[in-house]
Amino acid sequence: EVVKNAAEVLEKVQARTEVVGIDEGQFLGDGLIDVCMGMADAGKRVIVTGLDTDYLGRPFDPMPRLLAVAEEITKLLAICVQCGNPAVHTQRLVASEDLIVVGAAGMYEPRCRRCFEPQLAHEKIAAEKKNVPAQAAGPNRKQDI
């Protein structure tokens, strides 16, 4: 069931619930840590998935703070669509300065450290403002390395 914030998670959990699974934890706000800690203190197993960095490669709160208090961490990596190496970043392919842009297929793709272009979304915004094709907006980082 979809929830909009961490407080709504508690509304869905029943006293007899033993395991709570939360997907896309980065979207649930700062209350996520207290909610998870409270459920764990109550004896529930809490499993949270989410992105630890945003489209610019910066820590994506509240996930880094949740990682700091987690008892067990498993970091899963995708495969870079550019070169096939392990992907540690999420590349935004659309023009937007918003931190959160809920996307469909083709808006994001997994990238490794070498192929990740954090400035790409900003270059696309600048290109749209100038009405210039996005590839002409700036250097291709992969060719510069």
What residue spans do the PLM features occupy?
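Short acidic-hydrophobic, aromatic-tinged amphipathic segments that line or gate anion-handling sites
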Residues: 1-5
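Extracellular and organelle-lumenal recognition/adhesion modules and their flexible linkers in secreted
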Residues: 16
